[in-house]
Amino acid sequence: MNMAIQTIKYIFWLLPILGLTQALLQNPGDDFPFSTVIDILSENVEFSTFLRIIQKTGHVQYLNELQNFTLFAPINSAFIKGDQTTDQFEEHFHIEDFLIHDRVLQVRDLENGTYLEKRAAKAPLLLRKHERHCFVNEIAVVEPDLLPSFQNASLQGINNLLLIQPQINELLVQLDEETQDLKIFSDFISSFSNYNAYTNSSTVLVPLDVNFRKFFNTIEINYLLDKYNKLGKSNTISQAKWAADRTSLLQELIIDDVYGGILPKELILENKNNRKLFMKSNSEGTSVSVNNSDYSPISNRIFEIGVVHGFSDLDFLRTHIQFDAEKYLHGLNCSEFVKELYFRDLEKFIQNGRKITIFVPQASFNEDRGYTKPSLLYHFVEGKIDLEQDFSSLRPIQYAPTQIYDSAFCSSAKRLGGHCQKFKITRSNKGYYINGRFKILNTKPYEIGNTSIYSIDDDLQLPGDLVLSLAPENHCSISLMLLKELNLLDLPSNHKGYTILLPCMNSWDNNDLTIDYLRSNKTALNLLMRNLIFEDLIYSNNYSISTTVKNLYGNSVSIGVQKIVGSQNLTKISVSTIKESIIIEESSDIFFNQGVIHPIDQLDFPVDLEISLKELIETTGTKEIFDFFNLFYDLSSIIWNNEEYSLLVPTASSIPLSGITANSTNLRKFLELHLIPANVTQNLLDCNGSISTKLGTKLNCRKDHLDNVFVSIQGDWTKEVRVLKTGCTTNLKSSCIFLIDKPISLSWLNSEKYHLRLPGIAVGFGVIIGVTIAISLLFCIIITRGGKVKDKNQRGRNDRATTPLIQHSPIIHNPSYSATAHLSPLSQPTFEGSYSVNAIQTPRDIRRVGSDQKGGRSVSTS
């Protein structure tokens, strides 16, 4: 072994001596036999600029000592073509940018095609041979294969400068501008702060946007890119999952070392996830394929320390990434919502495989909300909701179809007895709404595994207390006022929940007097309202149930719920303590924090509550009515026995002004004029149709633009009374009291006597007689007028001689300015008669009403 080493040393010592001996023996005219790349550069003037830069930067010795390399030397014209000046080039000059180590390139030996030359710690070079022409990084080799004799090297003269290659993120931006199809991966790479650690000296398989969208939807892409810049600030668990997914995807697309151009057949490589990949190139090396994909439309694009190939159909992008609801919520810009779930230990709802439906507010409404655990749970349903499928069986008719669902908030034992709080979804022409307030933005859910996600336009709020849960359009203010007077707006916790049948909408119409009575009688008010509240949860979709519950009095009550046959959206609720069945709209339930409210548009009284005519009259304050009716036994029984009549009751202040007293001779007629049979009461309640009185007089009803109700004698609208309030008895809804602002005067009936009513035949005869008399009078006037004219002519002839030639004419008044100047006083109408039919009566001195009734029976002036 030592002998071999000694022999090699002797050889190295002898080589310079032999070279020197050959030089001494050589003739002076012969070329110098030992040349280096520096010698070649100095011997060729076209390389003078490049040589000067090498000398100036001190690389001559370095190049002389190198072996087994290729140098690409720009000719002088390259420095003129380039954008950089020579000084700028010198400033950034690195000799390694122009070298290939461990390879002596000879262009003449290259076959036609594209070749990728690796270089340690430098960007690879792309060589392309076409016929006799060769290019390096698309720069023409104009002086090929210049070989020094004293170095194992080659020099290739090129006509342009080899520029520094861009970083990978810069290259991807450039490629996206060229193709308009590389935005996603470009953003993906840029989102890594240390992407160079993955891509240096690597082959990067770049999926085009079309490739990404083939395997990832928009939500998943948003998650991978962290489009909303939230994941970096999320909880540590979410951050770790996100970082692992992104790293896995990036490593799936990176192969250590540089591969491109013409590749060996059956080339099997591994990516950074240790997945085996089969890579091949086409015959020219201009495009590559991975795992039998289509050949890359973008190939052999060089970056700082690597090469990029772009693909449209890589099939392994999704291999190492498993999506769940949590990742989808991040992709929907709901990272704050996810953070709250972790904070409340509710992350299981977005991680397990159970069927879950989530209603999540859009991004602008889920930031810094400070959710409570119950409010978060109210956004979840343990089961799948498919709106289009769930509502497909509900035909689009006049009403808005509604479905009721259980939320995941089921822990309110005190308030709801452990039952889950519900919500309802209603479909209208404008879309789907939760509890009538929160619009669902996507009718088709985002689905991942067993989870369905709906986005809503605002944060879903848990039902509040009784008052807050009722929207103004329900018109429940009167019932709420009555509940407030009974301190029933906040019900005690009963571990069961409550069901309230609440009169709303039009239920209190025509019941103003009833309200006044109830407010004045707390016993009656309690009897009504407490019989409408039940200690259990009964929903409108609990069809065909019959159960016994307790009302707020503590009494057991039987309740049945049935769907009305033949109706599309009506439900009947039967309550044993209420006289009539209650009809409600299906799914009209309103949820509050202690149960459910059923708004009803009818006022149904408990069987134990009786409101009579007597009590309603007392509520009006017109006590004189009782005195008047007590004078007539048959009439008084109407009030005391609740007979089927309604009564118009004037206000107490208007009775004295009317002149009606207990001594009035027409008192009975007055009372009968204000009594209305029950069978026509509805006409007055509806203010429609003819209204007959017990007296036989017909009344009319009208409403003004403010819905004020006025009643008058039929055929005479000049005198009318206004209905102030109405209330009906509990036994008979057509037996009511109408409080009016003043009585209907009997004098209004007397005015009818002055109206002449003649039959049609009499009118006809009158016309004939009138025409005959008119013709006769005209004939007489003509005869009389003719005689006067004749006499005047005769007298005119006799006086002509004595008549002056000029005489003053008397002043003649224009009859058009004095149409009544010649009327007799008897023919002129009086002021009273022309102003009003009532004005011809002597005015009544109201100060004397009642003052002249000394010892004698007064006579009513009405």
Curated annotation (Swiss-Prot):
N-terminal signal peptide: 1-23
Keywords from the UniProt entry: Glycoprotein, Membrane, Repeat, Signal, Transmembrane, Transmembrane helix, Vacuole
Annotated TM spans: 763-783
Membrane topology recorded in Swiss-Prot or TrEMBL: Single-pass type I membrane protein
Subcellular location: Vacuole membrane
One Pfam family recorded for the sequence: Fasciclin
GO cellular component, one term: fungal-type vacuole
InterPro entries referenced in this protein's UniProt entry, alphabetically: Adhesion/Biosynth-related, FAS1_dom_sf, FAS1_domain
FAS1 domain boundaries: 34-162, 463-604, 606-744
Residues bearing carbohydrate: N68, N112, N152, N200, N291, N333, N450, N521, N542, N569, N663, N679, N688
Record carries keyword Transmembrane helix: yes
UniProt topological domain (Cytoplasmic) ranges: 784-862
Vacuolar side: 24-762
PANTHER family for this protein: FAS1 DOMAIN-CONTAINING PROTEIN YLR001C (PTHR10900:SF125), PERIOSTIN-RELATED (PTHR10900)
Further facts: Present with 206 molecules/cell in log phase SD medium.
Protein name as it appears in the record: FAS1 domain-containing protein YLR001C
Organism: Saccharomyces cerevisiae (strain ATCC 204508 / S288c)
Lineage: Eukaryota, Fungi, Dikarya, Ascomycota, Saccharomycotina
